[in-house]
Amino acid sequence: TLDRSSAASDVYKRQVKDYVDIVEIGTPIVINEGLPAVQHLNDNIDGVKVLADLKIMDAADYEVSQAVKFGADVVTILGVAEDASIKAAVEEAHKNGKELLVDMIAVQDLETRAKELDEMGADYIAVHTGYDLQAQGVSPLDSLKTVKSVIKNSKVAVAGGIKPDTIEEVAAENPDLVIVGGGIANADDPVEAAKQCKAAVEGK
């Protein structure tokens, strides 16, 4: 995840990309620089998908359409959004051949909501331990297990405080997508960190 424009360096564009499948434009960049940041990344990196972490809450079809217009392959919406918003986002993403990731941050009843989102056609359901809970030592592992146990069609993503030295425990639960932010972006050697994460996910 790129959360600050200073992180969007040639290292990420040309080297880290060799070890990732999706590069995320984090919410802080979207807030500070707007969707042109998504376009910029899309224009300057090849061979990986671009995820725009908009954390949509309302006007979902419009916001998805704008992210897609600027080159996003995957767009995020909050799981606490209204069903009508999520259904509209799914429809807009799929109409354009793109994917929707539903972020479960702040969802209280994970099991029930995951089932509902699965039925609505979400491409990814992401269990997410936010920065504020990470500071309290909360891990996404239990949430990951809960969501995996109840969904039938959606893929499962996991995010929140994952680093090269903790990713093996997460990877052991076989999520479809592991989202690593600061564990790569803030590492002394981001390329080596990305390489370690990829190896852990692939079980090497």
Model-derived regions: residue spans:
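Alpha/beta catalytic cores of nucleotide-metabolism and tRNA/nucleoside-modifying enzymes
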Residues: 149-159, 163-204
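Glycine/Thr-rich beta-alpha phosphate-binding loop at enzyme active sites
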Residues: 113-145, 154, 193
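Single conserved hydrophobic/aromatic residue that forms the stacking wall/gate
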Residues: 1-8, 12
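Glycine/small-residue-rich loop that forms an oxyanion/phosphate-binding "nest" at active or ligand-binding sites
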Residues: 40-92
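Hydrophobic faces of well-ordered beta-strands that scaffold small-molecule active sites
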Residues: 23-25, 50-54, 75-77, 100-104, ...
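Glycine-rich phosphate-binding active-site loops on the catalytic face of alpha/beta enzymes
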Residues: 72-83, 125-134, 173-194
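Alpha-helix-loop-beta-strand connector modules within alpha/beta enzyme cores
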Residues: 31-55, 89-106, 140-160, 197-204
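Catalytic cores of alpha/beta
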Residues: 59-69, 109-119, 162-177
